[in-house]
């Protein structure tokens, strides 16, 4: 019995060693490697602010017009033209946008959606085929993360994902472990689905 336990532990450790060795090998960056520049998708004036496979954030005090700023960024991406100071171009196969709001009511989310459509020069009486806007206010952080993950796994060709209220993906904003977990999740999403996430 004791020998069986030791063998199981060694086998388990051997699998873990193999897994870590594989991760180490796959993670090495070598001078002889070549990488393509990630596609640039959003600019302010002539400065690139977003590429596929990365994420960014808008910061500011409460009620400092962050959502309006993000609305202009989304409108530029949706229209493929300049809106305010934002210029955007999502590549073929990555033209869809997922907008996730975690804090506002459905009424206020609808107001933001209308603003985006107006800024993009699109009708406010018809849904855009390239924009999915979801309101997750009434759900728990765990459910919100699961719904976003589910939406991304559907393979709808999202090039840009907006998470308005990333702090609402965690129970305790002061928990460093929870914060790290949410940031790691967004990094995995942006890399796995080759899209830009803006929070």
Where would I find each of the regions flagged by the language model?
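The Walker A/P-loop phosphate-binding site
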Residues: 12-116
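Interdomain "pre-motor" coupling segment immediately N-terminal to P-loop NTPase/helicase cores
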Residues: 1-14
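Non-membrane alpha-helical structural segments and their capping/turn regions in soluble enzymes
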Residues: 67, 145, 176-180, 184
């Amino acid at each position: 019995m004791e020998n069986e336990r030791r063998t199981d532990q060694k086998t388990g450790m051997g699998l873990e060693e193999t897994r870590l060795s594989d991760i180490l090998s796959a993670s090495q960056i070598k001078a002889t490697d070549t990488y393509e520049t990630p596609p640039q998708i959003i600019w302010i004036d002539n400065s690139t602010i977003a590429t596929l496979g990365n994420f960014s954030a808008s910061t500011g005090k409460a009620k400092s017009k962050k959502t309006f700023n993000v609305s202009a960024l989304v409108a530029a991406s949706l229209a493929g033209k300049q809106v305010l100071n934002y210029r955007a171009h999502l590549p073929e196969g990555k033209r869809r946008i997922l907008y996730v709001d975690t804090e506002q009511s459905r009424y206020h989310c609808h107001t933001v959606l209308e603003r985006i459509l107006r800024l993009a020069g699109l009708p406010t009486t018809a849904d855009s085929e390239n924009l999915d806007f979801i309101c997750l206010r009434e759900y728990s952080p765990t459910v919100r993360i699961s719904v976003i993950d589910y939406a991304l796994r559907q393979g709808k060709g999202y090039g840009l994902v907006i998470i308005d209220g990333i702090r609402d993906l965690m129970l305790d904003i002061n928990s460093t472990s929870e914060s790290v977990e949410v940031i790691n999740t967004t990094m995995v999403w942006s890399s796995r689905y080759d899209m830009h996430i803006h929070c």
